[in-house]
C-alpha cells in the first residue's frame, strides 16, 4: 500500500453501498481519522475494520491536523472518513487534504456516495450546470436566487417548512425537489413549486433540497403584477431590482411597473 492520505467515502444510509476498495483501504492503513469515532465504530464492526482510529472533526482539526501531517511525512498511511458520504463535502476533511497538499504528501481518493449528487440526479432537474451551497442559509436565499442554474442544498427537517415558505416568497417561479432519506427504506422525492409544497406533511430525516434553474421565459403581465403586489411595500430601488430578477425583465421595465402600481394606489 502506497504511503499517503486516503480520502474514503462511506455509505449515506445503505451499508451495501460500501465499496470493496473502501473496506480494503480502511483495513490496511495505519490510522483512520474519523469525524466521530463512535459513529465509525458501528461501520467498522460491520466490516471487520480493526484499524486504530482518532477523532478529526471541525472542533479539533486545528490541533489534530498537524499531528496527522507529521505522521504522514514519516511514511504512515492515514485514511480520513466522515460520518457518512465523502469527507470534505459539507463535512470535515478538506483542511487535512489541503495541509497534505501543501507539504507534498500524496493524496488518494476512494470514491463513495454523495447525498448532494444523488439528490440532484433524483430531482430530474438539469445537471449540466449546478451550484452546491451546502447547508441552506435563509439569509442568503435572495442572493442565491441570482444563480440561474440548478442549486443544491442540505437542510434540516426542523427548518424545512420555514425554508419552503421563504422560497415561496423569494423564488416562487422555480420548482424545487425535496429528497429525503436517500438510499434508506423511506427514500422519497417531492417536487413542485414552493407554494404547492407549503401544505405537505413536514418531511423527516436527512434532506437534500434541489432548486430548478430560473425560467428562461418572461412571466405574464398577471404574474408580474402578483410579484409587484408582493414587494410594493419595499423601497423603490430594492423593489425594482427584486422584480427585475424574479420576472426576467429589465430594471427600467421594473421601475415602470412599480410606478404604474403606485399610480393605481393614489
Roles of regions detected by a PLM:
Residues 95-147:
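Class I SAM-dependent methyltransferase SAM-binding "motif I" and its flanking Rossmann-like core
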Residues 26-32, 104-107, 150-151:
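Short active-site oxyanion
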Residues 38-40, 86, 115, 159:
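Alpha-helix capping/helix-boundary segments
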Residues 1-58:
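Glycine-rich, flexible N-terminal cofactor/catalytic loop recognition
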Residues 2, 76, 150, 154-266:
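A contiguous loop/helix-start segment that scaffolds small-molecule binding in enzyme catalytic cores
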Residues 74-85, 89-92:
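Ordered, amphipathic secondary-structure segments that act as subunit-interaction surfaces
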Residues 56-62, 136-137:
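Conserved helicase motor
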Residues 34, 109-112, 153, 178:
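General beta-strand structural signal in soluble alpha/beta enzymes
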